[in-house]
Swiss-Prot record:
Family as reported in the entry's similarity comment: Belongs to the amidase family. GatA subfamily.
GO biological process: translation
Protein name: Glutamyl-tRNA(Gln) amidotransferase subunit A
EC numbers for this chain: 6.3.5.7
Pfam families per the UniProt record, alphabetical: Amidase
A single Gene Ontology CC term: glutamyl-tRNA(Gln) amidotransferase complex
Substrates-to-products reaction catalysed: L-glutamyl-tRNA(Gln) + L-glutamine + ATP + H2O = L-glutaminyl-tRNA(Gln) + L-glutamate + ADP + phosphate + H(+)
Record-annotated active site: K79 (charge relay system), S154 (charge relay system), S178 (acyl-ester intermediate)
Enzyme class, spelled out: ligase
Length: 485
């Protein structure tokens, strides 16, 4: 039995009783990485020397009997688009291959203050643009459940590392499903918080009105502990919300009697794998037995979500990525004859194909002749999508459906057709456009591959999302299943 089969609260108890040391936990993480990393390839950069030094320092504090919190001394993996002072941050793209940040993201400051230990930085799609982690500029991460399949994306390294037992939990980011989709593919728990619940300061921006940092864990309770540590208003991020952060762990009562669930008919219709559909219906039956009721509803503008998202996200990416020019940091071409040449060649050599595709799409949507027809119209449709959610939430507590239309697909299966790749996020994207919280929890298997159940909540009501997810988790054992590597 691995130490990481224990929950956060169990590990905390073991540390308090001195049955294990923090150094033991760090050793276990690097031991497991040494055992499976060649197969999974989740990490881009390891932080071994600093992690072991911090473990020794925290062990000394523990020996003195100092008061500690639940995350104290626990190893964590960090998606490589969250800046870490003194630890290389690449966003999995060539143009930032040597970027060494001089400050920590706010979430890193909060994790460090809580005593968490950064094990390393995790692979992803370049600048978080992708649904399979195949767009990484450095390596291909594989799904621990089937090494011939993708782990999902863009937080594929984070989900794969947790599923493979390399770390007990990890941070990811979610712009259109990039936490929830890989969590579903890898059979772990992933939450996208409400937009503004977690500071984005220090998150390398893809689409600023959609991006949100969130936790990927083995269990719902662990997820709640991690969100508790990173949530809250931040003066360094003007979009972070000054909304009180409740005690998420206290919300895990297991009681969902009288809960009203909405199930959008758009989420179980055409394009959803039959095995996935049956897994979700079985999950709803479990929730019914626990005292909840569910009804079918409609989110009529969902069919426009994919087009709306790719216009808005690509437009924001076009603006955000203009700063990567080879002047101040990162890669700079050696082949330039003049300044303009340097800009062009640095970006063409430093960006991958998917990043270039989205910059082109965004620049086109923002151009003077097409701004009203594309970008402005997409913003109007986004408002309609948000209203759909608001209307449903007037009558129901949560919305439930599958996280993804299918289980994990094979490596290389969708790379030649970007539209089929984009369509894999069709059930997660509306949540980002509306800015509401959503979690993916394991709810079954299709041909030995995990299936995710998506539970969507009202703005800043992560507590109810967690309560429902935890009640379902405790009534099933899908979260206890582990891949064999």
């Amino acid at each position: 039995m691995s130490l990481f089969d224990h929950s956060v609260s169990e590990l905390h108890t073991l540390l308090q009783k001195k049955e294990v040391s923090i150094s033991d936990l760090v050793d276990e993480s690097y031991r497991r990485i040494g055992e499976v990393e060649e197969k999974v390839q989740a990490f881009l950069t390891l932080n071994e020397e600093q992690a072991r030094a911090k473990a020794k320092e925290l062990d000394d504090q523990l020996a003195k009997g100092e008061e500690t919190n639940p995350l104290f001394g626990l190893p964590i993996g960090i998606k490589d688009n969250i800046v870490t002072k003194g630890l290389r941050t690449t966003c999995a793209i060539k143009i930032l291959y040597n970027f060494d940040p001089i400050y920590d993201a706010t979430v890193m400051e909060r994790l460090n203050a809580a005593g968490a230990i950064t094990i390393g930085k995790l692979n992803m799609d370049e600048f978080a643009m992708g649904s399979s982690t195949e767009n990484s500029g450095f390596q291909l991460t594989r799904n621990p459940w089937d090494l011939k399949r993708v782990p999902g994306g863009s937080s594929g390294g984070s989900a794969a590392a947790v599923a493979a037992g390399e770390v007990p939990f990890a941070l990811g980011s979610d712009t259109g499903g990039s936490i929830r989709q890989p969590a579903a593919f890898c059979g772990v728990v992933g939450l996208k918080p409400t937009y503004g619940r977690v500071s984005r300061f220090g998150l390398v921006a893809f689409a600023s009105s959609l991006d949100q940092i969130g936790p990927i864990t083995r269990t719902v309770e662990d997820n709640a502990y991690l969100l508790q540590a990173i949530a809250g208003v931040d003066p360094m991020d003007s979009t972070s919300a000054n909304v009180p952060v409740p005690n998420y762990v206290e919300a895990l009562t297991g009681d969902i009697k009288g809960l009203k669930i909405a199930v959008p008919n758009e989420y179980l219709g055409e394009g959803v794998d039959e095995g996935v559909r049956q897994s979700v219906l079985a999950a709803l039956a479990v929730l019914e037995k626990l005292g909840a009721t569910w009804e079918e509803v409609s989110l009529p503008h969902s069919k426009y979500a994919l087009a709306t998202y790719y216009l808005l996200a690509s437009s924001e990416a076009s603006a955000n990525l203009a700063r990567f020019d080879g002047v101040r940091y990162g890669y700079r071409t050696d082949n330039a004859k003049n300044l303009i040449d340097m800009y062009k060649l640095t970006r063409s050599e430093g960006f991958g194909a998917e990043v270039k595709r989205r910059i082109m799409l965004g620049t086109f949507a923002l151009s003077s002749g097409y701004y009203d027809a594309y970008y402005k119209k997409a913003q109007k449709v986004r408002t309609l999508i948000k209203r759909d959610f608001e209307n449903v939430f007037e009558r129901y507590d949560v919305i439930i459906g599958p996280t993804t239309p299918t289980p994990a697909f094979k490596i290389g299966e969708k790379t030649s057709d970007p539209l089929t790749m984009y369509a894999n996020d069709i059930l997660t994207i509306p949540v980002n456009l509306a800015g509401v919280p959503a979690i993916s929890v394991p709810c079954g298997f299709v041909d030995g591959l995990p299936v995710g159940l998506q539970i969507i909540g009202k703005h800043f009501d992560e507590s109810t999302v967690y309560r429902v997810a935890h009640a379902f988790e405790q009534a099933t054992d899908y979260h206890k299943q582990k891949p064999v590597l």
